[in-house]
Amino acid sequence: MSKAIIVADLKYKSPKRRGRGTGHKGLHSTLKYVQYREDHNAKASAEKLRDRWQDRGLGAHYREIFEACDRLKSKHVLAWTWVVSPAPDLMALVPETRRRDLVMDVTERVVEAYYEARGYQTPPYSYVLHDRLTDEGEQQLHTHVILPGLAP
């Protein structure tokens, strides 16, 4: 059995509240958590965590992103949430000083290629890079990507 090189997890947030983590409140909470979650190796100031979004047209702060998603929602989708996570054992082969930039580059290429392959223009989106440890103690750099509900 082959092993995934990059794991992409695509989900959506409905505008309707159907329990914990759903609806407008669920998206707002998710965006705030993603923005302020600390990395495994550093205690960061709230000011540093505030500036961690990579804005590709959707916003650079969780409130701005939330408002854009609310404005650009569809009937059934408030926002799309993706997680792009390269395999930790493969990332370990990359020099540590280049890993963050590589994961950010891969994220942008994944988003752009997804829409290009379907014949669509890339919609506005934002993403944040997280650094966590796996249960085995390996570094797991990954990104959380947010796209508006109108994105195809």
Regions found by a protein language model. Give the residues of each.
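N-terminal nicking endonuclease/strand-transfer module with a His-rich metal-binding environment
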Residues: 1-152
